[in-house]
A protein has these predicted regions:
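Conserved PLP-anchoring active-site segment centered on the Schiff-base-forming lysine
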Residues: 1-13, 20
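Short beta->alpha connector loops at strand-helix junctions that form conserved
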Residues: 3-4, 23-27, 102
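Short glycine-rich anion-binding loops that position phosphate/pyrophosphate groups of nucleotides
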Residues: 7, 48-52, 106, 189
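Short, structured coil segments at secondary-structure junctions
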Residues: 17-18, 94-95, 179
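Active-site phosphate-binding strand-loop segment of PLP-dependent enzymes
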Residues: 22, 27-82
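PLP-dependent aminotransferase class I/II
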Residues: 97-177, 181-184
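Conserved PLP-binding catalytic core of the aspartate aminotransferase-like
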Residues: 166, 178-207
């Protein structure tokens, strides 16, 4: 199970590996309907904050979904969590079925290094490593490893960068409001906005010109 409006590669990978899936509709505010994830399923994945909406779900909602799916794996994709609120990492020791995935591509601005990682209990990590080693034992090059290590060391630079991005996001919201836009309350580094008089294609073409 995963949301119908979400990261575009969930269904791509599911189709590639012939994994059947079911998309769950978001509510009218583009938020998860947690009860839709109570049904029997083979696994759950969802991003928090979501992309492309930017919506951040409170940790209580995340935990509720995990708690109702303890017989299957629940993956919380936290690519944008550094711009939002509390992480599901604090639930790792409480739920054996939880995997939290994060990346250096967003808040650390290192998309080109292709650094991503999963955090879970030792048993699930072992299973992930078994699967990884059967496909590609060396998923990161030396340059990425060195850059990743140095990025982790410089916590001050990272925190300052996140702070500036969040400040810019809030400034952008104010400016969009002045221009007549409405938008969702973003917990990411982007804003999902619309204008009552112009559709997305018109705006795109005008900006492109």
């Amino acid at each position: 199970l995963f949301p119908d409006v979400t990261y575009s590669f969930y269904d791509v990978w599911a189709d590639l590996y012939r994994i059947p899936y079911e998309c769950q509709k978001l509510d009218e505010d583009f938020k998860l309907v947690k009860e839709d994830y109570y049904k029997e399923n083979g696994g759950v994945i969802f991003p928090n904050p979501n992309a492309p909406t930017g919506i951040y779900e409170d940790l209580s909602v995340v935990e509720d979904i995990i708690a109702h799916n303890q017989d299957v794996i629940v993956i919380v994709d936290e690519a944008y969590i550094d711009f939002a609120g509390r992480s599901a990492l604090e639930l790792i020791d409480k739920y054996d079925n939880l995997i939290v995935v994060q990346t250096f591509s967003k808040a650390r601005s290192m998309a080109g290094m292709r650094i991503g990682y999963a955090i879970s209990n030792p048993t699930l990590i072992k299973y992930l490593n078994d699967a990884k080693y059967s496909f590609n034992s060396y998923t990161m090059n030396q340059t990425s490893i060195v850059c990743g290590v140095e990025a982790v060391k410089d916590r001050e630079y990272f925190e300052n960068g996140v702070r500036k991005i969040v400040e810019t996001r809030e400034w952008a919201k104010e400016e969009l409001t002045k221009l007549g836009f409405t938008y969702l309350d973003s917990g990411s580094n982007f804003i999902f906005a619309k204008h009552p008089e112009y559709d997305a294609k018109e705006l795109f073409e005008a900006l492109k010109a």
